[in-house]
Amino acid sequence: MTTNQTETIWKALDNLRIELPSWGFANTGTRFGKFIQLAAAITIEDKFSDAAQVHALTGACPTMALHVQWDLPHGLQDTGKVKELAKKHGVKPGSINPNVFQDQEYKFGSIGNPDASIRRKALTHILDCLRIAEALGCRDISPWFADGSNYPGTQSIRKRIGYFEEGLKEVHAALRPGQRLLLEYKPFEPAFYHTDIADWGMAMLLAKAAGPQAYVLVDTGHHYQAQNIEQIVAWLLHHKMIGGFHFNDRRYADDDLTLGSVDPYQVFRIFHEILFYEWETGKRTDIAYMIDQSHNLKGKIEAMIQTVSAAMELYAKAALVDHK
């Protein structure tokens, strides 16, 4: 390897930041159950402590994404505690994730629900999350919507599009300067007939309808088998609509395996598309790289370190491609 190549790698890695998910350090499972790990995080302080360990060993993870209902159950009242923990452990709060899928009222959806009172409940929660983000100095709000239906004819797909457009415009109008709304998509699960935001095109159209501070978030596990994710990334780059990633690997669907454990070449191709765009335009992209994984069998901290290390290695390899 030449001196220039070595310098290229170090320069690329100096700019790479990967956000850790608070929920990735806690006990998680499948619908069949979960295996308890004695070292899994229980409290928000445990999560900050574990994230700090990963950051200490990788040097690339200065922020941790928070899930409001799980990490800040008392909303704004908990922001003071979060600030103290962030200062103590040297890891800042990152993207703020609303929870509009867990409560019983969301059986038929959140902001796509045909019941106006439930749509209002979901929107009120998301607007509260914006205030939490402002209090913590967080830029990105990353809602994932499980909204959809399981059977034909049970919901009006077109009406629900309108509900989403209306609701997301209201959320966008409440964004502070510099804040971003990142819209995630997923083709299926938990809805199996139709999902309201099922692919990148739907997410992009809704983001554009919401306003200029709304972008698309790509979860690498939220795609059909053999789908060309780097082509999706290229389209979003072309339209300047890509805001972030949720990194994980999969064999079949949204398996949430450690990044690069199944298809590292795909991760390389995604990074290559982004770095090629930066080389071609001479502009750095403003993309939030985040992890979203469920470590049911592996140790939590070890799995995070594996993921970050794999991302760094593949990003470095992509940076070495000579576009001339």
What kind of region is each of these model predictions?
Residues 38-45, 113, 120, 162, ...:
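Conserved phosphate-coordination/catalytic loops
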Residues 83-94, 115-125, 160-174, 200-209:
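Acidic, His- and aromatic-enriched active-site or binding-groove loops in soluble protein domains
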Residues 59-62, 107-110, 148-150, 183-184, ...:
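A short alpha-helix capping/helix-coil boundary motif
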Residues 129-155, 179-184:
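Active-site groove signature of glycoside hydrolases
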Residues 1-134, 317-324:
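N-terminal pre-domain/capping segments
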Residues 1-25, 29, 33-36, 52, ...:
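Histidine-acidic metal/acid-base catalytic patches
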Residues 113-118, 148-159, 187-192:
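Surface-exposed cleft-lining segments at the edges of enzyme active sites
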Residues 24-26, 68-72, 97-102, 145-149, ...:
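Active-site-proximal loop/turn and secondary-structure-junction residues that shape catalytic pockets
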